[in-house]
Amino acid sequence: MASILHYFLALSLSFSFLFFLSDSVPIPQHHTNPTKPINLLVLPVQNDASTGLHWANLQKRTPLMQVPVLVDLNGNHLWVNCEQHYSSKTYQAPFCHSTQCSRANTHQCLSCPAASRPGCHKNTCGLMSTNPITQQTGLGELGQDVLAIHATQGSTQQLGPLVTVPQFLFSCAPSFLLQKGLPRNIQGVAGLGHAPISLPNQLASHFGLQHQFTTCLSRYPTSKGALIFGDAPNNMQQFHNQDIFHDLAFTPLTVTPQGEYNVRVSSIRINQHSVFPPNKISSTIVGSSGGTMISTSTPHMVLQQSLYQAFTQVFAQQLEKQAQVKSVAPFGLCFNSNKINAYPSVDLVMDKPNGPVWRISGEDLMVQAQPGVTCLGVMNGGMQPRAEVTLGTRQLEEKLMVFDLARSRVGFSTSSLHSHGVKCGDLFNFANA
């Protein structure tokens, strides 16, 4: 009996040692490639309380491990840190000038002088990866390995089995890209941009799905949201006996040369007051091309400096001046929470003057900066930001966002899911995910 106890004690200590050795967590190997056609794929997503950004546990390698990665709507591909504790029986590094390198749109050859390991081989392809928070870049090795994700038929809240992509392309990026800006313990970034080897495009290609994905980001760190790959509006119509997709409004979606998702905003109104007079709406401030980027790499809306100044002025005019208090960094306009019952709503008129309206409620804009002080969660992006308007995670949370890449359009909920009595965390049973 003593020898058995010693055995189990040693086994327990071994597992504890392995857990602390790596941020990646092993998972049970229950996965399959079903014969039934796959309608949808689901990746659970969590809200990081300290940053307001969203991350997911990707299931990769052989044996499968959970790898925590930031969700980057505009990223070109998946990149992970391979320098520490990357162990897999199925990792491969495609040779330079191979078809995999062409698919990844890279023709740069890379050779690592050290001993071979994931991320370090001779005569492979180099792929540039970016930390979307700091914009720092680094060159890494193009690799391929197993990726697993939950399948579902969309008619149930239960997640289906794990299905696999045996040779999923990604970058083994240098570890210094993880040093700043990312949530704690993150080991990489999952790019959802419209690029050849982004997560949505590889999944659609491998499983024969529609080139479409839906985001439902949870506002609450204690519940999970989801990324849904495939045609969710036609496969998830009924939820609690109601069609949660019925109030979607669509607007044209453009993709920049960098693979970023942009929409056109025709005008901005605060409590029906125009931020600019009508004859200036299409000026370079808002931009004839729209200049509005949808992003998950910032929690707050970001405006070009001139637009920010006009926006905050009109917003402040809608509230009593005596309610304003000293601003709390990094915010520029703050209020005494006890003196205000309701905050103005903001309407973004999409595409053209009579286009669909994206309404941003006070809940989607305001941030409690400290006890008794609530601030406008809109940031000054300076004179030359990446886009005149950037919509952040606060504007995307608790809404259905459908990125229909095949039709070059994006659908957005014209009301919060809360109006249906549900949250993003209710869409699926994530208990075992």
UniProtKB/Swiss-Prot annotation:
Pfam name, any one: TAXi_C
Gene Ontology biological-process annotations: proteolysis
Secretion signal, residue range per the UniProt entry: 1-24
PROSITE patterns: PEPTIDASE_A1
Gene3D superfamilies named among the record's database cross-references: Acid Proteases
InterPro entries linked: Aspartic_peptidase_A1, PEPTIDASE_A1, Peptidase_aspartic_dom_sf, TAXi_C, TAXi_N, Xylanase_inhibitor_I-like
Limits of the Peptidase A1 domain: 54-413
Keywords, alphabetical: Disulfide bond, Seed storage protein, Signal, Storage protein
Gene Ontology MF terms: aspartic-type endopeptidase activity; nutrient reservoir activity
Function according to Swiss-Prot or TrEMBL: Seed storage protein. Has a protein kinase activity. Binds leginsulin.
UniProt similarity note: Belongs to the peptidase A1 family.
Subunit structure of this chain's protein: The mature protein consists of high- and low-kDa subunits linked by disulfide bonds.
The protein's name: Basic 7S globulin 2
Species annotation: Glycine max
